[in-house]
Amino acid sequence: MAIHLKASHLGVAVLLLLFGGAIGAAGGGYLLSSGQNHSSPDSPVNTSPQSLTPAPVESNYRSALPLTLPRSAQDDQELNFIARAVQKIGPAVVRIDSERTAVSQGGPMGDQPFFRRFFGEEMPPNPDPREQGTGSGFILSSDGEVLTNAHVVEGASTVKVTLKDGSVLEGKVMGIDTMTDVAVVKVEAENLPVVEIGQSDRLQPGEWAIAIGNPLGLDNTVTVGIISALGRSSSEVGVPDKRVRFIQTDAAINPGNSGGPLLNAKGEVIGVNTAIRADAQGLGFAIPIQTAQNVAENLFTKGKMEHPYLGIHMVTLTPEMTKQLRTSGELPAGVTADTGVLIIQVSPGSPAAQAGLAPGDIILEVGGMGVKTATDVQERVEVSQIGEPLAIAVKRGQKPQMMAVRPGPFPEDLGQ
């Protein structure tokens, strides 16, 4: 991912790149820029004779300072919950450096709408045919199974995993699922520290959220906030092609944090830090760990994650949307409703076409549950079983009908 890069920062960005900053990623690069120099000159010193030769002072005062130093603040009893969580999970958080050959002249992230949506249009061209990037990840098993974001390692020719102790290991990408932005990497090692998995499905807004990762290449950075909201749909976040209900947090998530863990107050992983909104502050998003873990298990065992597929294009009707479709000529004949989920198009030969679904049908129920939005339909389909009948109730004209659709696997040629 990349930060908005403004003209006044270009010089700083180049310096950072030259000194090992992240400069792009397989599928999503990280460009560094900073608006200020954090190194400040020494404070002025008074060099007057008075200050150099102070008069001696006699005193019988006995220092009240203890003769022994107090107990270190690093003592477990002195640590706050944030420090304890970081101490617990920090060793299992890794840095992931990837490199690939550039395939686009449109900048480090090419023309991918996912990254343009989050980080804007001001992405400079990349003259180097190689794209390098830095992200984060965390260790799931002591023998080297690592979870990260798909955009961190997608298309990478080389992947290097750096442990907290500085050890650098060669990583092998075992699988990528772009529909959830989850990927898994394997390193050859033993007795590695591992994270503890929490329950993302039990979260409540207002709970503490702790992010660990390598933002802007600054290893082992910790930021803190709260869970701002739960269940953000991909369309709400701005990436409608992702089959994820995101956790929203105001914990700072920056380029390089991608793939790192989001923790609860106990130091358990509850999410995978994934994205921020460039047009706002304090809007970070993470994939719930239960979603990511399920995908990771499939990627490690099968090398891929199969998502159920119907083969329909649909929209959530509102009075405004109905009017817009009517004006553009895209409203199927006979449709008068201005609420519900309207099928606009059915892909030829798809499971939906084979079951008899047609443009103009308004979806009422999926799997016995009522649906009001296209997101509702997508989520009901996502939890269905490939090849098993899925009951879909529709209204065609003024008549309700029940269809039995057998979802197929999402076609690879659609690029997920």
UniProtKB/Swiss-Prot annotation:
Induction: No induction by UV-B light.
Key word Amino-acid biosynthesis present: no
PDZ domain: residues covered: 320-398
Domain of life: Bacteria
Disruption phenotype: No effect in a single knockout, but growth is inhibited at high light (120 umol photons/m(2)/s) or at elevated temperature in a triple protease knockout mutant (hhoA, hhoB and htrA). Triple mutants are not phototactic. No effect on the PSII repair cycle, even in the triple protease knockout strain.
Record field: compositional bias (Polar residues): 35-53
An example Gene Ontology molecular-function term: serine-type endopeptidase activity
Region annotation Disordered: where it falls in the sequence: 35-57
Record bears the keyword Phosphoprotein: no
Swiss-Prot/TrEMBL keywords: Hydrolase, Protease, Signal
Record-stated family: Belongs to the peptidase S1C family.
Function: A putative protease, its function overlaps that of the related putative proteases HtrA and HhoA.
Record protein name field: Putative serine protease HhoB
Organism this protein belongs to: Synechocystis sp. (strain ATCC 27184 / PCC 6803 / Kazusa)
Gene behind this protein: hhoB
